[in-house]
């Protein structure tokens, strides 16, 4: 068997995995190509998105946040999708692929728990066994999502070594897949990892961009000035960017985790501070030491706490199609509070990074007429305790 799809985005991407996994990845690519041509598969997938997951999701105009400015700020409401985030889109597609390949079990990793919940949902629905690897630190800060996964029959496996976060959970999931690939499907949660995962996940998240393109035309009869999304691995961003990538007049902005500041060791901004290397089965920017060791990333948002990024984002940065910036923890928390207070919408901390940058733009040029769209990739129920603790600690330190 040989590859049929391009496995690189410029110099980034590839299939850097143990030789034993190459046939499994090529089989996955083959099944994906055939599924994309299969009307029955496509119909089943679209029906699940509509009747089960709740698509299309709304494009909501903020009523109060932009008061006193000439800007319009729209939110693409992936937080309203079944499961609470954009993750549900692509796990339904991958679960259908797993069934098509006659796989009986699903393994995956999760950081914020949103991907883990989504995988649990799809596995429960399609009667697949499910095991999720999750860093012990992430399990502690995302206890609600851990309970959700267990309620749906998922075995959640804590990862204690290393930084005990998403990076280490990814390593453990790939390690298990290397010995169980004949009967398991590894369900990567983002547009990272070895080929063909970045392409598959993008295809199943493309619905966000196509819906948003049509909705903004209906609302405004024109295109937005900018589309903004947070970047961890980068699937929600690739999803919404795909609807506008070929329109140069629409600025695309990816927002990384600034953590405690890019001048510190505590951030997750691999596109701005990383060096190209091999990690998680791909060639992409990585936070690494001078000796080539993978550094620990950091973000108050568990889903952005990842030391690398999807290879297509690296390519889009290199060709200057997308501008990548960072938002620190404090700015994200402020945006989290503002959206909750003024619009009655509690965003995921990950999404709050994108919102914070949008508010920066609006407040820097309050008299400018502009239309901005933020991908509200998930809801923030999971983050309320984290934010409350951060605010309490801030008060104590005053």
From Swiss-Prot:
One of its GO terms (cellular component) is cytoplasm. It catalyses: (1S,2R)-1-C-(indol-3-yl)glycerol 3-phosphate + L-serine = D-glyceraldehyde 3-phosphate + L-tryptophan + H2O. InterPro entries: Trp_synth_b_CS (IPR006653), Trp_synth_beta (IPR006654), Trp_synth_beta/beta-like (IPR023026), TrpB-like_PALP (IPR001926), TrpB-like_PALP_sf (IPR036052). It holds the Pfam family PALP. Its cofactor is pyridoxal 5'-phosphate. HAMAP family: Trp_synth_beta. Tetramer of two alpha and two beta chains. PANTHER family: TRYPTOPHAN SYNTHASE, TRYPTOPHAN SYNTHASE-RELATED. This is Tryptophan synthase beta chain. The lineage of its organism: Bacteria, Pseudomonadati, Pseudomonadota, Gammaproteobacteria, Enterobacterales.
